[in-house]
Curated annotation (Swiss-Prot):
Annotated region described as Binding to host EIF4G, given as residue ranges: 226-289
InterPro entries cross-referenced by the UniProt entry: L4
Entry-annotated residues carrying Phosphotyrosine: 309, 627
Recorded GO CC terms: host cell; host cell cytoplasm
Protein name, UniProt field: Shutoff protein
UniProt feature, compositional bias: Basic residues: 656-675
Name of the gene encoding the protein in the UniProt record: L4
Primary location: host cell
Cysteine-cysteine disulfides: none
Subunit structure: Monomer. Interacts with hexon protein; this interaction allows chaperoning and trimerization of hexon proteins. Interacts (via N-terminus) with host initiation factor EIF4G (via C-terminus). Interacts (via RRM domain) with viral mRNAs that contain the tripartite leader; this interaction allows ribosome shunting and expression of viral late mRNAs.
Length: 689
């Protein structure tokens, strides 16, 4: 049956259109006859000639703004790049702080290369110590994960000195070489029989003998001043030979003076004492300063909180869920709060077992390195010539006590008391560590591996793979890295990051560490659980103001208010900073009874629960409409035989007649009319009937 064509003009198809053989002629119809469009439309109105130049104009304005305060115009690309980075990343005027505490977005950063590492901020992070990898490194220890396993009751690790480690062994020890191992004399890594899959692939694809370890030494100004006054006088560089310091390169303490202090002229004894002092200046004082910075109770707590943000773990994960705000988008650096939504905090959930522990341990190690380097960079920048002169005077006072001390640990403590005073330590404890995410540490990890000549995308290497796990298996210059590795391992177990203990229901965000249980965990704090059920369910206000004005005072528990109080909630008496002491393994109750965060009085909490329950019962019994469970969506007041209904329907399904029953009798006067819904709007719990 043919159809009549639609009225309109017919437009024939172009001749170059290819159609199958014996196909009908294709025609298109225009419903409204209009003049034909121009063959070549004018696009000047859409993209003008000057439109694309706005990008260059904006970038030129930023570059011009970066050099306006300089006395001389930069004449090279490097000078201009440095000025450009300083203007963007280190402005003279600090960025404006928003109401939520973070800095406002800087549109100038849109013109900085996104994945380029800025040189201005990396004042201390770009320095490395290229050193030969010990054969006894962690990668050549097949049972390193088992050796690093910690249990209930284990304490903070301590560092070693030459007092306890007199000899160092760098070798494979009792490790068994794999039968099919490749013979590679250029690589330190050896294929072992019990290597895990990650290390087996790494050793087969990587040949390496040296590694660029991140610099962890004290600020250069400090080291130079201490060495000039304790070890060897440094010769001042000068272009004129006549101006060279004749005392340059000479020992600060002569053999005559040292023999008089030690009451001996034995050359071996004098040389041994000099080595002890040199070791304390170059190694032990660094270890002592690290221990003082990272092991105070407040610092251990702050490191634990940082790790909970970095790995979106425990109480931080619970706070994100209840507040419906991704708190892990916040990062800090040098006292400035930033909001960045590109960071990842859940990458560790994609791996399990030993690989997961290796990744988390390495990430925490990098966080400690990053924190230490940040502190050293700030310290270096703050030192002036007057500070160094006063430091030289203090070092001169302890010169004789150091050279007459026989314990290298005590030497390090005496020296740390001078160069790392309590005031400086207190300042660092207040501002560090920074809150970071896993993406930042992954970039830091790639930066370290690239400086070591290792391509991160083609190997599965971690910086901690090239660090020995025992002090007796590495040279003293590697001891700071071993100490930070063991500290990172302790923080991993102390904050319960190595195992996934989460479950369903109340155990969804369960963490066994002292920061979470028992006070910030719904499974162990029933009072706080009851409080969370009241969030957003009430709004209590006082009497109204004059002329019907609303009350200015009231009580309303919002998710934001509860989350703020929840994040501040902490009981120091139930926190064990220097020991793994999980709450679930204890038979005694907590020192402080777990309480809610905002509504701390149990009587008020109970009354609010009774009001909430009575309101729910009233809505289910007296309210009209169908009420749905907010979580499952199931009807809470399902339709059924009603003792209040006066209609029973009969019929064939199409025409039903109401039937009066005995329950339709009117008692106590005429029946009240049903409540009317305003505009038919649904209740917050369900939908209107």
């Amino acid at each position: 049956m043919s159809e009549e064509p639609v009225s309109g003009t017919t437009v024939e198809i172009e001749e170059d259109t290819h159609t199958p053989p014996n196909s009908p002629v294709l025609e298109t119809f225009s419903l409204s006859p209009e003049p034909e469009a121009e063959a070549c439309p004018n696009t000047d109105r859409y993209l003008s000639a000057n439109l694309l130049c706005k990008h260059l104009q904006r970038q030129s304005a930023i570059v011009l703004d970066s050099i306006k305060d300089q006395l001389q115009v930069p004449t090279s690309v490097s000078e201009l790049s440095c000025a450009y980075e300083r203007s963007l990343l280190c402005p003279n005027i600090p960025p404006k702080q928003q109401s939520n505490g973070t800095c406002e977005a800087n549109p100038k950063l849109n013109f900085y290369p996104t994945f380029l590492v800025p040189e201005t901020l990396a004042t201390y992070h770009i320095f490395f110590v290229n050193q030969k990898i010990p054969v006894s490194c962690k990668a050549n220890r097949a049972k390193a994960d088992k050796a690093l396993t910690l249990q209930e009751g284990d304490c903070l690790p301590d560092y070693e000195t030459m007092d306890t480690v007199s000899r160092v062994f760098e070798g494979l020890g009792g490790e068994v070489v794999a039968e099919n191992a490749l013979q590679n004399n250029d690589s330190v890594l050896v294929e072992l029989k019990e290597d895990n899959p990650r290390l087996a692939v790494l050793k087969r694809n990587l040949s390496v003998s040296h590694f660029a370890y991140p610099a962890v030494h004290l600020p250069p100004k400090i080291i130079t001043t201490v060495m000039n006054n304790l070890l060897v006088k440094r010769a001042n560089p000068s272009a004129d030979v006549s101006e060279l310091d004749p005392d340059g390169g000479q020992e600060v303490v002569s053999d005559t003076e040292l023999s008089r202090w030690l009451n001996t002229s034995d050359p071996e004894t004098l040389e041994k004492q000099r080595k002890l002092v040199m070791g304390s200046v170059l190694v032990t004082v660094v270890l002592e300063c690290m221990q003082r910075l990272f092991t105070s109770k407040d610092m251990v707590k702050k490191i634990g909180e940082t790790l909970h943000y970095t790995f979106r773990h425990g109480y931080v994960s619970l706070a994100c869920k209840i507040s419906n705000v991704e708190l892990t988008n916040v990062v800090t650096y040098m006292g400035i709060l930033h909001e960045n939504r590109l960071g990842q905090t859940t990458l560790h959930h994609t791996i399990q077992g030993e690989t997961r522990r290796d990744y988390i341990r390495d990430s925490i190690f990098l966080i400690l390195i990053h924190t230490w380097q940040t502190a050293m960079g700030i310290w270096q920048q703050c030192l002036e010539e007057e500070n160094l002169k006063e430091l030289a005077k203090l070092v001169q006072k302890i010169k004789k006590p150091l050279y007459t001390e026989t314990s290298q640990r005590l030497m390090g403590k005496q020296l740390a008391n001078v160069v790392f005073p309590p005031k400086l330590l207190e300042t660092f404890n207040k501002g560090l560590p920074d809150i970071v995410n896993q993406s930042m540490m992954q970039n830091f990890r790639s930066f370290i591996l690239e400086r070591s000549g290792i391509l991160p995308s083609m190997t599965c290497a971690l910086p901690t793979d090239f660090i020995p796990i025992h002090f007796k298996e590495c040279p003293p210059t590697m001891w700071p890295y071993t100490y930070l590795l063991r500290l990172a391992n302790f923080f991993m177990y102390h904050n319960d990051l190595c195992y996934d203990m989460e479950g369903e229901g109340l155990l969804e965000h369960y963490c066994r560490c002292n920061l979470c249980t028992p006070h910030r965990c719904l499974a162990t704090n029933p009072a706080m659980l009851n409080e969370t059920q009241l969030i957003g369910t009430f709004d209590i206000r006082g009497p109204g103001g004059e002329n019907g004005a609303e009350s200015s005072s009231g009580l309303k528990l919002t998710a934001g208010m509860w989350t703020s109080a929840f994040l501040r909630k902490f009981e120091s008496s139930d926190y064990h900073a220097h020991k793994i002491h999980f709450y679930e393994n204890q038979s005694k109750p907590p020192s402080v009874e777990p309480t809610p965060c905002v509504i701390t009085q149990s009587s008020i909490l109970a009354q609010l629960h009774d009001i909430k329950k009575a309101r729910e019962e009233f809505l289910l019994k007296k309210g009209q409409g169908q009420y749905l469970d907010p979580h499952t969506g199931e009807p809470l007041n399902a339709a059924g035989p009603s003792v209040e209904s006066g209609h029973e329907f009969q019929g064939d399904g199409r025409h039903r007649e109401p039937k009066r029953g005995r329950h339709f009798r009117q008692r106590g006067g005429p029946r009240k009319p049903p409540r009317a819904h305003a505009g038919g709007e649904p209740d917050v719990r369900g939908t209107t009937s």
